[in-house]
Amino acid sequence: MVNHKLLKLDPGLYLVATPLGSARDITLRALDILASADVLAAEDTRTARKLIEIHGVPLNGRRIIAYHDHSKASDRSRLLAHINNGLSVAYVSEAGTPLIADPGYQLVRDARESNLTVLAAPGPSACITALTVAGLPTNQFHFVGFLPPQQTARQKKLAELLPLNATLVLYESPKRLKALLSDIETIVENNRQVAVCRELTKKFEEVKVGTPSELLEHFELKAAKGEIVVLIEPGGSTEIDQSDLEAALLEAMDTLRIKDAADAVAGAFSMPRREIYQLALRLKKDSLTP
């Protein structure tokens, strides 16, 4: 069965998300673009070729051009020249969504500066997948990617990030995971919840949630392997003054509809939207009561 169809793509740069591990996680639109683009570029040409072969997408004489973090400005210029000449260019990173802790930023920046069309075929992302399954707050999150490998620099960066009232999303290698957990344990109170999400969407997927010390104990007994996403529970004070909350909500309701005011205040205070909406309705009712 052929899952792709050939399209007439307009000239432009098409950023195509690819599976993290399970080849079946690719979207039909991604297959259409990979089958139809005039030019194919990839962070890892071997991985891209394997994915294309799995899904029966014919190359039809097209070669896959390598583009990665070590590519030169001249490599970007050649890719963008294809677009200027009326061709479509599809780009994939090794896995997941291009630019999200993956190459592609400078390519997109140069394309935008040249007023070229840039489009995305969205799909898998390790960051979003980890947030989905870990059970930590998702109303506000801060994507960090990889921290510095050196301990001093890593601890300094963590000290800046850990007070944020947002779930932190980090990528880490298996060999540095225990060092990272140890640093977190050193800097924050040990009741802070951390999730280690390993090999997401793959056969040996594992999600462990606990305090830094609990996770250190777990990974002392069982060495971590594969691709790892680490999520850290939000910092900041969890004590919210009710009068401050109501004052902010009343102020927002002066200029916004109740639903929009509730959404804005819920985001600002990192609280459930439904709870804030119910409070807004009560405040509105009280204001109408003589």
What is each model feature region?
Residues 2, 10, 88, 167, ...:
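A contiguous loop/helix-start segment that scaffolds small-molecule binding in enzyme catalytic cores
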Residues 3, 106-164:
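Class I SAM-dependent methyltransferase SAM-binding "motif I" and its flanking Rossmann-like core
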Residues 12-16, 86-93, 141, 166-170, ...:
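Generic beta-sheet signal
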Residues 34-40, 115-119, 167-168:
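Short active-site oxyanion
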Residues 42, 120-123, 170, 196:
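General beta-strand structural signal in soluble alpha/beta enzymes
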Residues 66-73, 147-150:
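Conserved helicase motor
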Residues 99-114, 181, 185:
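Short Gly/Thr/Asp-enriched flexible loops that form oxyanion-binding sites at enzyme active sites
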